[in-house]
């Protein structure tokens, strides 16, 4: 898969692609990373890519001439690539979008914004706008790197096991369960016994419980209506005994943890009062 960036600061892209998983993926020929600098399409001594906005206002706006010329050059190299402009006004990146990109079979051209953003006419040469969240960064290079990293994890051979990507948080629709490694005991904190049992059925059950509990506590918006009902509502009458027992145990654990947290908050209030 090929990733071509249109950044004002290509060294940020080159630096990110020269380390860790991305570097190994590139060395194996699984991904190709390159840049086209819009400054190379300017015609003044200062290589100017921005100008003041019509109508007034703070900041500078990226000029259409060098940006569009760079996009044209990128499309010459990757004629079938999807052109994505990184900007706050785009649709927000989610794991489902990452997987859509990864399985599309397409290459990607990332156009990186800066300053107050793009001249609106630049978007005529863009397939879609993409944001990584509801906050503003200095430039679009880091968001574009994040998207490349997320996509690359789904390319066969990039990770040790493709399951590593498929089992990550958000790929399953749930937050990830806690992970542990050696030593068994660290400063009085022990690895849960179930993870050392070798019983994979029990381990999988424990992991699912932890994922559901974490998601309910931290990101309930990720749960489906059915999952929320199983965790907090009435259990269906027709249900396998093993499944019913699983959710009854899980609900009891959730209730106990909520009671424990409430008790700790009361003690803290009393101490501060």
Residue ranges of each PLM-predicted region?
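Short glycine-enriched loops at secondary-structure junctions
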Residues: 38-41, 114-118
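N-terminal nucleotide/polyanion-binding subdomain common to many enzyme families
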Residues: 1-74, 201-217, 221-224
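S-adenosyl-L-methionine/SAH cofactor-binding core of RNA-modifying enzymes
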Residues: 63-112, 119, 156
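Hydrophobic/aromatic beta-strand patches that form the interior of the parallel beta-sheet core
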Residues: 4-6, 34-36, 82-84, 108-109, ...
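SAM-dependent methyltransferases
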Residues: 183-273
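Internal, active-site/partner-interface "lid" segment
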Residues: 142, 154-194
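Structured adenosyl-cofactor binding patch, chiefly the S-adenosyl-L-methionine
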Residues: 118, 122-168
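Short, solvent-exposed amphipathic alpha-helical segments in soluble enzyme
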Residues: 20-24, 99-103, 127
């Amino acid at each position: 898969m090929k990733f071509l960036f249109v950044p004002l600061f290509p060294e940020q892209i080159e630096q990110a692609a020269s380390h860790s998983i991305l570097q190994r993926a590139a060395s194996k020929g699984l991904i190709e990373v390159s840049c086209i600098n819009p400054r190379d399409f300017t015609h003044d001594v200062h290589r100017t890519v921005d100008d003041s906005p019509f109508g007034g206002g703070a900041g500078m706006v990226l000029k259409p001439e060098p940006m569009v010329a760079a996009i044209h050059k990128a499309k010459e190299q990757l004629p079938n690539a999807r052109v994505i402009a990184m900007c706050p006004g785009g649709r927000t990146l989610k794991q489902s979008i990452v997987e859509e990109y990864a399985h599309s079979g397409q290459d990607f051209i990332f156009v990186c914004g800066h300053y107050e953003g793009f001249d609106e006419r630049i978007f005529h040469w863009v397939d879609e706008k993409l944001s990584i969240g509801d906050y503003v960064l200095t430039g679009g290079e880091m968001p574009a790197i994040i998207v490349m990293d997320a996509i690359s994890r789904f390319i066969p051979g990039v990770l040790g096991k493709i399951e590593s990507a498929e089992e990550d948080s958000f790929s399953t629709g749930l937050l990830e369960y806690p992970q542990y490694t050696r030593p068994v005991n660290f400063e009085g904190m022990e690895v849960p016994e179930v993870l050392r049992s070798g019983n994979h059925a029990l381990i999988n059950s424990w992991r699912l419980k932890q994922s559901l509990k974490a998601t309910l506590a931290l990101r309930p918006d990720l749960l489906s209506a059915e999952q929320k009902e199983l965790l907090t509502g009435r259990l269906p009458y027709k249900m396998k005994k093993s499944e019913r027992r699983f959710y009854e145990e899980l609900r009891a654990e959730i209730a106990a943890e909520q009671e424990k947290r409430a008790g700790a908050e009361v003690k803290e209030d009393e101490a501060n009062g």
